[in-house]
Swiss-Prot record:
Its main location: cytoplasm. Interacts with GOPC. GO terms for cellular component: acrosomal vesicle; outer acrosomal membrane. The gene is Fam170b. It is found in: Cytoplasmic vesicle, Secretory vesicle, Acrosome; Cytoplasmic vesicle, Secretory vesicle, Acrosome outer membrane. Pfam families: Spt46. It comes from Mus musculus. GO terms for biological process: positive regulation of acrosome reaction; regulation of fertilization. This is Protein FAM170B. Residues 277-339, 349-378 have a biased composition (Low complexity).
């Protein structure tokens, strides 16, 4: 038994029929049948354009607990295409309005001059000229117009969503397929500029590709999404870091000046204290000075008493012990004036003295002997 759902106006929707079955049949199988293929069970999916039912009709169909069978017609396909085109047209108009509201911004592409051998960079530009890649390169900047993003996409989350929308834009603006003859002619064309190997070139800091001219590098930085990879996110991140570093360097001297000014103001406030505020501060200072003087006097008295005790006579034993403990100090010798030597009589032995005395006594004895001889001669 089939029933047709009719709108409130009394008109039947063209090309749409809803089949309703008994609740027993609904328990066995519940699914939505599409003409192009089968869907999973109990899975909701978007339905093309005018094939959507009004809210009231869907509510009635749900209460019936039946199986819904959708059948599309050429009119429904054309209406779905019209709906997708209208959605794209509304999105394109909203995008153009956003572009009018936000003026285009510029971003700097980072690159360096290099010398290449078969497309491979072997030396790059430094402050002293072209040197091997082990040295620090001289990085240059070139401005290009920034690619506009959708609202709601953050800077850090770059953006599978942004890339997807841009790829869709490229597909919409791509020219229509040409004849096979034109395709054959395209195969005979020369390779692009960025594939040509030269002795000199410009190397992109983000992707390290070498380009023959600055125009080719800027075109790559702006429309690199067509090749499947965009260097713009890298350039924006590097410039953002550079800005934050410059801001920190600018803030450091300002903070130093503020600290100096604050310290000078504090010193001024301390010097500009009112006299009635100075008096209570002076009183405790005077008390402290008096206390210090008293303490010094007490210390002096104690020292004097200690010295007096040391000067009192000690017993002999203690004095001897102190003398023993004290090391012997050498006394300086006194120099006496030299006196001339005088001959002194050497001591003679007793025997020699006796002999001399005997000799002195001998002459009178000889005289006595000679006298009798003389008398005899007479």
């Amino acid at each position: 038994m089939k029933h047709h759902l009719i709108e409130h106006r009394g008109e039947q929707t063209p090309g749409t029929a809803v089949g309703m079955a008994s609740p027993d049949a609904a328990e066995e199988s519940t699914g939505v049948c599409w003409p192009g293929g089968a869907m999973r069970r109990n899975e909701s999916s978007p339905r093309p354009g005018p094939a959507f039912l009004p809210d009231d009709d869907i509510y009635l169909a749900a209460r019936a607990q039946g199986v819904l069978g959708w059948s599309s017609s050429p009119s429904s396909q054309s209406s779905s295409e019209y709906q997708s085109y209208s959605q794209y047209q509304s999105w394109d108009s909203s995008k153009s309005e956003e572009q009018q509201e936000t003026p285009p911004e510029s971003v700097c592409a980072l690159y360096t001059h290099v010398q290449t051998v078969r497309g491979v960079a072997v030396a790059w530009e430094t402050d002293d000229g072209f040197e091997p890649v082990t040295r620090k390169p001289l990085i240059r900047e070139a401005e290009f117009i920034k690619r506009q993003r959708r609202k709601g996409s953050s800077f850090e989350m770059a953006s599978n969503t942004d890339l997807r929308w841009e790829l869709e834009d490229c597909k919409h603006y791509c020219p229509q397929t040409e004849d096979p003859v034109d395709c054959c002619m395209q195969e005979l064309r020369a390779p692009p500029d960025w594939l040509v190997t030269t002795n000199h070139g410009l190397r992109c800091v983000a992707c390290c590709r070498v380009f023959p001219t600055l125009e080719a590098l800027l075109d790559h930085a702006q429309h690199g999404i067509q090749d499947g990879f965009s260097c713009q996110i890298f350039f924006e991140e590097m410039l953002e870091r550079k800005r934050t570093r410059d801001q920190k360097q600018d803030q450091q001297p300002v903070e130093e000046e503020q600290s100096l000014s604050d310290s000078s103001e504090c010193t001024r406030l301390l010097t500009k204290v009112l006299p009635w505020q100075q008096q209570p501060q002076q009183q405790p200072q005077e008390q402290q000075k008096q206390q210090q003087q008293q303490q010094q006097k007490q210390r002096q008295q104690e020292q004097q008493q200690h010295q007096q005790q040391q000067q009192q006579p000690q017993p002999l034993k203690q004095q001897q012990q102190q003398q023993q403990q004290q090391p012997l100090q050498p006394q300086p010798l006194k120099q006496q004036p030299l006196q001339p030597l005088q001959p002194q009589p050497q001591p003679q032995p007793q025997k020699q003295q006796q002999r001399q005395q005997q000799r002195q006594q001998q002459p009178p004895r000889q005289q006595q002997k000679q006298q009798p001889l003389q008398q005899q001669g007479k």
